[in-house]
């Protein structure tokens, strides 16, 4: 049984491949290419700043090679402007052969008129004897609205309604190496080319035109925690990890870093995770970690997911 695939996150794909592709390659019989894609999963994560996210996913095989996925969830950013609580809708599909796999995933986050974000991601993987090399491509379009403080020209400040937009494309590569029978190492790097704009939505309000103001854009868009990292606009990101697998238990450690768009500083995290097959068809995956960002400081976070495959 495979773990869930989270849209827009290449790191989840890498961890999944590192944990389950190697043993699949050593089976005496040859299972369908979409073996392990019939499951339902529920997972959540939270940190000590009250940032939270919950996501449930249903995956179903189609024929012998393809599969489709759908998910719903909710996140809450404790330090985001206005206490943002977007709902999450995800969808995905994939097709796999003996050595190649193609996936397409999309996600949409929305909190009324305050926040909307759409991500589309595709990956093409080459697999051989538990080793994986892949190419990732992404597209993002996000918009956030709220009140921001601007100089009023009289030595003080005033709050005005404003709107920030971020859009652009990204490309990345990822890979996994089966170092020994029990040890896998994996990693990923990505580069995104984003364009951001911030504008005042009420021309009659004091403060003048906001124009291209990255500080205000970051204040509106948020995304400064590991939990809501999927909402952060990262110009560059990288991840490296390793896993050790026993018969029914796998333990992995990861280090992730990224550079926030428009000079927003760095985000970093270290995480220790486990995947435990507790009963036929059932897997639980707890995790703990520590993250930091130049905007949000240090946080401790934890995660837990449960997956049932049949």
Predicted regions and their residues:
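Transmembrane beta-barrel strands of outer-membrane/channel proteins
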Residues: 40-46, 70-74, 104-108, 135-141, ...
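Short glycine/proline- and aromatic-enriched beta-strand/turn motifs that initiate or cap beta-hairpins
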Residues: 26-80, 301
């Amino acid at each position: 049984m495979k773990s869930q695939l989270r849209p827009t996150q290449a790191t989840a794909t890498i961890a999944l491949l590192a944990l389950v592709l190697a043993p699949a390659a050593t089976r005496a019989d040859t299972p369908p290419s979409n073996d392990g894609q019939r499951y339902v999963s529920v997972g959540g994560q939270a940190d000590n700043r009250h940032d939270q996210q919950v996501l449930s996913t249903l995956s179903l095989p189609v024929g012998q090679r393809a599969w489709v996925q759908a998910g719903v969830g909710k996140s809450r950013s404790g330090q985001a402007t206005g206490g943002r609580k977007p709902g999450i809708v995800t969808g995905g599909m994939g097709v796999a052969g003996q050595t190649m796999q193609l996936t397409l995933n999309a996600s949409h986050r929305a909190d009324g008129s305050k926040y909307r974000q759409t991500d589309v991601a595709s990956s093409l993987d080459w697999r051989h004897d538990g080793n994986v090399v892949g190419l990732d491509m992404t597209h993002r379009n996000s918009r956030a609205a709220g009140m921001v403080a601007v100089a009023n020209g009289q030595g003080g400040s005033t709050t005005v309604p404003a709107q920030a937009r971020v859009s652009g494309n990204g490309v990345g590569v990822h890979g996994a190496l089966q170092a020994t029978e029990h040890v896998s190492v994996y990693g990923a790097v990505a580069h995104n080319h984003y364009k951001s704009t911030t504008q005042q939505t009420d021309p009659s309000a004091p403060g003048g035109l906001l124009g291209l103001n990255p500080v205000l854009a970051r204040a509106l868009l948020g995304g400064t925690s590991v939990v809501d990292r999927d909402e952060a606009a990262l110009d560059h990101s990288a991840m490296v990890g390793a896993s050790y697998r026993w018969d029914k238990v796998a333990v992995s450690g990861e280090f992730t870093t990224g550079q926030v768009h428009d000079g927003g500083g760095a985000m970093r995290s270290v995480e220790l995770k486990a995947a435990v097959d507790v009963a036929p068809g059932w897997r639980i995956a707890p995790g703990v970690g520590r993250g930091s960002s130049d905007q949000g400081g240090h946080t401790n976070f934890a995660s837990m997911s449960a997956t049932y495959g049949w």
